Amino acid sequence: MTEFTTLLQQGSAWFFIPSAILLGALHGLEPGHSKTMMAAFIIAIKGTIKQAVMLGLAATISHTAVVWLIAFGGMVISKRFTAQSAEPWLQLISAVIIISTAFWMFWRTWRGERNWLENMHEHEHDHEHHHHDHEHHQDHDHDHDHEHHHHHEHGDNEEYQDAHARAHANDIKRHFDGREVTNWQILLFGLTGGLIPCPAAITVLLICIQLKALTLGATLVVSFSIGLALTLVTVGVGAAISVQQVAKRWSGFNTLAKRAPYFSSLLIGLVGVYMGVHGFMGIMR
């Protein structure tokens, strides 16, 4: 095979590199690249564009690293070692991590709602106790005290409703603006989503290695990964922008967003189960 430097001089590399980027982008549109999980994750945490980019890049980095590890590992371990033989094991590992992530998302949302309800219950109890003490120390006549009590109760009820609404809105904002999800958790989820190898990229790299054209193979794999990153980042950013726009234009979005993490965690869990079953069946063959 022609050396990469020669291809550069001939101008052929400028055809290979864009082609590899385009193939990577198209490859990212194929099923099985965690696009559904990434979109569900971004929607669940109401992630920002920065977090969406981070998620897509993390998935691409792990995807590229797996290609290199399998290619070189396969050459060291056995000539019969292929991407097809390693894929079921990686699917099984990814399934375990993905299901764990789905469970964590579900538990985090459920715990947050319980804590909020308990805090509101304690606030209501303390408010009623304070109201009782206020009545006890009144020095007015009975009729006036009764009227004052009625008016005060009505005002407190309105104040409580306003406080309840504000607390609920702040809780939704706190839970779904991404602040509770650390960058490390986003990176971990992205790295997990990119563990499934691409047999085509591994095959190209192996051919280039065997033909002693490592630089060319590395360049093609990196270009392929750039195209894949463009697709995954676009999916994540699209989900993030959609959430932000819907939240601005639809007042009822917060009500829906309160339940979104449950649906997202369920969807992610189902994808993880599917990957686990598929990987297990591949191992048993």
Curated annotation (Swiss-Prot):
Induction: By nickel and cobalt. Transcriptionally repressed by RcnR. Residues 135-146, 153-164 have a biased composition (Basic and acidic residues). Keywords: Cell inner membrane, Cell membrane, Cobalt, Cobalt transport, Ion transport, Membrane, Nickel, Nickel transport, Transmembrane, Transmembrane helix, Transport. It is a multi-pass membrane protein. Residues 127-164 are annotated as: Disordered. Residues 1-10, 78-86, 207-220, 284-285 are periplasmic. Residues 32-56, 108-185, 242-262 are cytoplasmic. The chain crosses the membrane at residues 11-31, 57-77, 87-107, 186-206, 221-241, 263-283. It comes from the Bacteria. One of its GO terms (molecular function) is nickel cation transmembrane transporter activity. Pfam families: NicO. GO terms for biological process: cobalt ion transport; response to cobalt ion; response to nickel cation. InterPro entries: Ni/Co_transpt_high_affinity (IPR011541), NiCoT_RcnA (IPR051224). GO terms for cellular component: plasma membrane. The keyword Metal-binding does not apply. It is found in: Cell inner membrane. The keyword Cell membrane applies. Belongs to the NiCoT transporter (TC 2.A.52) family. RcnA subfamily. Efflux system for nickel and cobalt. PANTHER family: NICKEL/COBALT EFFLUX SYSTEM RCNA, NICKEL_COBALT EFFLUX SYSTEM RCNA. This is Nickel/cobalt efflux system RcnA. The gene is rcnA.
